[in-house]
Amino acid sequence: MAVWIQAQQLQGEALHQMQALYGQHFPIEVRHYLSQWIESQAWDSVDLDNPQENIKATQLLEGLVQELQKKAEHQVGEDGFLLKIKLGHYATQLQNTYDRCPMELVRCIRHILYNEQRLVREANNGSSPAGSLADAMSQKHLQINQTFEELRLVTQDTENELKKLQQTQEYFIIQYQESLRIQAQFGPLAQLSPQERLSRETALQQKQVSLEAWLQREAQTLQQYRVELAEKHQKTLQLLRKQQTIILDDELIQWKRRQQLAGNGGPPEGSLDVLQSWCEKLAEIIWQNRQQIRRAEHLCQQLPIPGPVEEMLAEVNATITDIISALVTSTFIIEKQPPQVLKTQTKFAATVRLLVGGKLNVHMNPPQVKATIISEQQAKSLLKNENTRNDYSGEILNNCCVMEYHQATGTLSAHFRNMSLKRIKRSDRRGAESVTEEKFTILFESQFSVGGNELVFQVKTLSLPVVVIVHGSQDNNATATVLWDNAFAEPGRVPFAVPDKVLWPQLCEALNMKFKAEVQSNRGLTKENLVFLAQKLFNNSSSHLEDYSGLSVSWSQFNRENLPGRNYTFWQWFDGVMEVLKKHLKPHWNDGAILGFVNKQQAHDLLINKPDGTFLLRFSDSEIGGITIAWKFDSQERMFWNLMPFTTRDFSIRSLADRLGDLNYLIYVFPDRPKDEVYSKYYTPVPCESATAKAVDGYVKPQIKQVVPEFVNASADAGGGSATYMDQAPSPAVCPQAHYNMYPQNPDSVLDTDGDFDLEDTMDVARRVEELLGRPMDSQWIPHAQS
């Protein structure tokens, strides 16, 4: 069902919130009459931080105006005449408003659609059974909104009390002036006759005594009113503090944690709109109470009455200032984090936002934000309020930006679009720490004036830790540092402390999150996959995941120490798996065609009872980012065969599907799926022209085909036909016959001692020969060849 149809069914507060989304910036009538067109446009496809996307935004604006004009032209009749005029007026109004800033229209409509969907979703959840988590969130949000209503009522109550106090005090002052006037009348009585003077004095004295008694009583009443008002403000501030703690220390911190986990591939942190609405309500109520307290102080100064009120007001004034200071400084946040692996001389972006900028009128004097890079130690000193002025660890180009207020969405933000780290100054490293373990952070700082320069706040916020690299080869290890930090950072930590050890299940969760995000797949790591990884990491043979649940993994085990017998770390191997899947094998992983996380012996155990020609794909132990084919073919020499691993470089030449298609003795994908049924949709179409056909320029077109020379004789039997070596080799016109004799005559020279055809262990030798020759090896010498 269309969102607009559901939005029209909202009731109560939800309907009020929906109506508040519209106004001069975007009339609700436009939403109503163009609802279908608006919801069919790709508003989310426009990158608001990319100036080049301005063309898309302009096209959307033009489309909107044209649709409005078209709608207006189709109106007929008496009622249609008025609507025609109104829609035409809206078309002109929107054109004039957004002609020079079409991105703002996109931002506005995205904001409206997001909030409509949220309100509809919340309304639907409220009327139908929902998950316990959703219910808990709804209950929490309901409690927050109820507290805001309570705060609104008590603030209105203190406003009424303040007005009553002011009126009482004004009347008291009038009566006090009257007593002074009476006192002044005693002087002229000396000029009257004794009898008349006595009469007048008696009357004035009676009046004076009565008035002074009244003034004395009223002074006590005033003092009581003042104390009661101050006590009410104290209670209001207690409730405000509690509400602010829930919003800033719970909800906002949770959002920041989600943002941190999103850096590891977790779900998006979500919109800030709800948080901003809460922070704005806080700001509004805090400011109202602050103004009330200041007015109460003014009344006390206007009419001093000895008592405890002055001290009480000074206390609540200091408290309210602390509250507003905490609100402003805590709501200056990084909406879009800079890259956490930051390469020098490379453009990067970030966005900072002040969640209370609109309500406190900060945008009336747009502040400038400055970004600098500081070290972990400098970040610690900053949080201790130590003097770190001009103490930076590098130079960032284009590091200043003025905050802009977006009227349609009510957001105050600064978009750093073209920053670049020109240079970095590294600190002395500790022990075995490498440059890719050194953490920095981007410091954003500004100065905000609140209430017409009445209050001035110096605000600062730190980005998530970043690792600075100077070459792409460092990316792998830098990503490991970021992954560990994002996954295991504890709330309120000293920058940027993380546990040196974590439990294996914790690491499993982080690895699975990263894996699904990198491979862009819903098929995550299974229990069996995690057992394999645990066996690899702990050098253990147990096949029960529960046996590893109590074991700890240290950072050194994760990405500092090499795995036993290997020249790479656990993370480097795992990252290589993600890399090859992401770049070349994603559809096959999603199809379940890659088993992947099994070792050689496990592969043989799985294949032993399968028919000949059954194969599986597993990740290589000897080659980072390598994947190998293991298959069963029972011959006189051996039963199991393992092909030398393919890597990203191989798949950039010929795809996995085509390579498997070339090997016709591979028949079934483990456990029993016909190969062509799984892979045929990924085969590259074969050209219709014959291999000997000549192009216009006279050249013969070659073909690349996967060949396993040592398995040529077996292929005919496995394929069930009369396949010959020539079936798998190029045409003689492309590759001379004499060239074939260069293959080794004794296939056992590349076999394991146990007779298993495993060429993983020959790779280092092959690459060494390649280095000695100073040129790539001929494909004939590589156990699997593109011929």
Curated annotation (Swiss-Prot):
GO molecular function, one term: identical protein binding
Organism superkingdom: Eukaryota
Modified residues (Phosphotyrosine): Y90, Y682, Y699
Region annotation (Required for interaction with NMI) ranges: 232-321
GO CC entries: chromatin; cytoplasm; cytosol; nucleoplasm; nucleus; RNA polymerase II transcription regulator complex
Keyword Transcription regulation: yes
Annotated effect of mutating T684A: Abolishes interaction with INSR
Domain SH2: 589-686
Any single GO BP term: regulation of cell population proliferation
Keywords from the UniProt entry: Activator, Cytoplasm, Disease variant, DNA-binding, Dwarfism, Nucleus, Phosphoprotein, SH2 domain, Transcription, Transcription regulation
Quaternary state and interactors: Upon activation, forms homodimers. Forms also heterodimers with related family members. Binds NR3C1. Interacts with NCOA1. Interacts with NMI. Interacts with SOCS7. Interacts (via SH2 domain) with INSR. Interacts with CPEB3; this inhibits STAT5B-mediated transcriptional activation.
Function: Carries out a dual function: signal transduction and activation of transcription. Mediates cellular responses to the cytokine KITLG/SCF and other growth factors. Binds to the GAS element and activates PRL-induced transcription. Positively regulates hematopoietic/erythroid differentiation.
Family, similarity comment: Belongs to the transcription factor STAT family.
The protein's name in its UniProt record: Signal transducer and activator of transcription 5B
